Amino acid sequence: MATTHTLLSFDNLEFLLHRKDLTDLYGKRCGTLNLVINPYELFLPDELDDDCCDDPFNCCFSDVYASIGTEYSYIDPPDLIYEEHCATNGTWPDGTPCEPILPPFTITGTHHYYATKPGEVVSGILSKLRVFLGSLLRSTADVNSNFTFRAESDGPGSTEIVTEEQGTIVQQQPAPAPTALATLATASTGKSVEQEWMTFFSYHTSINWSTVESQGKVLYSQALNPSINPYLDHISKLYSTWSGGIDVRFTVSGSGVFGGKLAALLVPPGVEPIESVSMLQYPHVLFDARQTEPVIFTIPDIRKTLFHSMDETDTTKLVIMVYKNGADTKTTCSITVETRPSADFTFALLKPPGSLIKHGSIPSDLIPRNSAHWLGNRWWSMISGFSVQPRVFQSNRHFDFDSTTTGWSTPYYIPIEITITAKVKGNNHWYHVIAHDKALVPGIPDGWPDTTIPSEVHASNGNFDYAKGFHDDKEIVNPANNNTHFKGTYICGTLSTIKDPEKAENQSESQKKSSTMYVATADLGDNKVKPQHKISSQKLVVYFDGPEKDLTMNATLSPLGYTLVDDQPIGSNSSTVVRIATLPEAFTQGGNYPIFYVNKTNKGYFDKATTDCYNSQILMTSQRLAEGNYSLPPDSLAVYRITDSSSQWFDIGINHDGFSYVGLPDLPADLTFPLTSTFMGVQLARVKLASKVKVTRNSIK
């Protein structure tokens, strides 16, 4: 009897694979195939037959020897083992005993045997099957040099074509290399990216149309660019160039009620639209506002190069202008604009995420999404409202799309660092200051306030001299009752240090190293402090309780509040706004009005009281313009939709100079904060900005 296992037989193979499959392989039909496998052919050459080998360690067939497995030890002689094996492993359906696939190798004088590895048996069977199936799959077509393919027509065939040789010859392409075919086959097994955004229209903007608009008034003008579709704008960040048209769908909200006609014009690249009926000389169509179905236009891509760069704005424009109003009474409707890419739209030339392109990017992130992140660029508190003005101005910390400023401060709030050289004279409260060397503009500290005092005062000791009747704890009653010597200055907390404080003579002065200072831009001389609207290193003054001896102090200041002058917001009077040379300004244009962003500044002396402060930009807008690389034509606006919690909304447009505009002469006082901002694209500055708000005659404070 065997002491370990029996020899590998067909019965073992049935267990490893499947009994039915192996039964089919051993002489029976397998599906539609007829394959017979002789197991002796898997390992032994034909001339060896089924004889046993008596010298396995000097095998004449090295490949056969490599398939030999573990040595098995038996007590009984080979003949007895063979008979026992046949008796214990059953028979096939035809009565034939299950014999071993390969007779064991024997070593003369012992009863040690070597059996074939099971994996080698399975591999041999699969190899035979592969060869057999390959012969069946081989093409039997005649592929000589005269062989051609011919195409079939999609429509009814011509009666003249009676043989296949008369069809249209389809040119054969060179067959891809096997490695390329393998790559394509692997890639095709993955799930392709869905492109449903190519088929549906996405909201872009809304347009207000009033019957008071004159004929030829441009309501909408849009140059072809990926930024007018939210999905194209998102994907464009991965590419350097684009090409193709965009479909635009207009839906008039007053359809069936609101009368009048509009003209849709296609303006070629290089031509700027004007508000005149002469624009109808360009290709155009007219559509009636009373029609209930949306109107779809396609902005075609007219170009002289293969692709457009992402900043290119000299492209085909779609212009919507008033052709004819249908009523004498004032009525208004809203036109919803939606976009989708045309079938020929495509991107090209991938670029790494985050890489900068020299021509500039789309100005889509100048205003933070949530108003909780809106700080002013004049004062560091949160924006709480807007003020629409016919004229807006600011120099310091105001940046344009060229990343330039006419001011002296960086777009960050940092402590003001100055040096004060005190000379004791008759006045020991007003002092000139010297800026540190790391200032943006030499001689002027970074962050120095940009307003001056309202009027000339004596350079003497002062206090909060608010006479009775000036303020009633809520608001200013009579501005004339303000006799404070340092009104109009900014109140700063300080950290002051004195050189060599360990000296005995400086001990008393070192006790004053941290005291409140009042700073301003003014002209100090002849015991007088005069207003100065042009800043320079000689016009920087501070008011504080100075030392009683000559010494030099270094001070780090942090603005905390403002010494109240009157009931006017800080920065609302251009005569008190400080500049280096010129003062950047913005005026009403194209029915759009410039705005200040309003926040609150603490007032000195009055407990928990604040006053309004006007800012020309949101601080993050200043930061992005100073550090970024944005592309915006001089006659265009980067448009953001501002929406409050009650679904009121209005558009803010930022022009190339960095100033902001709205399309209303007043904004409602009941906007519910926080607000949200959404980038809507770029439009002409002459086109009125859209809105949907309850208009009042009061600006937000």
Curated annotation (Swiss-Prot):
Keywords: Capsid protein, Host cytoplasm, T=3 icosahedral capsid protein, Virion. GO terms for cellular component: host cell cytoplasm; T=3 icosahedral viral capsid. The record marks E152, S153 as: Cleavage. Signal peptide: none annotated. Pfam families: Calici_coat. InterPro entries: Calicivirus_coat, Rhv-like, Viral_coat. It comes from the Viruses. Capsid protein self assembles to form an icosahedral capsid with a T=3 symmetry, about 38 nm in diameter, and consisting of 180 capsid proteins. A smaller form of capsid with a diameter of 23 nm might be capsid proteins assembled as icosahedron with T=1 symmetry. The capsid encapsulates the genomic RNA and is decorated with VP2 proteins. Homodimer. Homomultimer. Interacts with the minor capsid protein VP2. May bind to VP3 and Vpg proteins. Belongs to the caliciviridae capsid protein family. This is Capsid protein VP1.
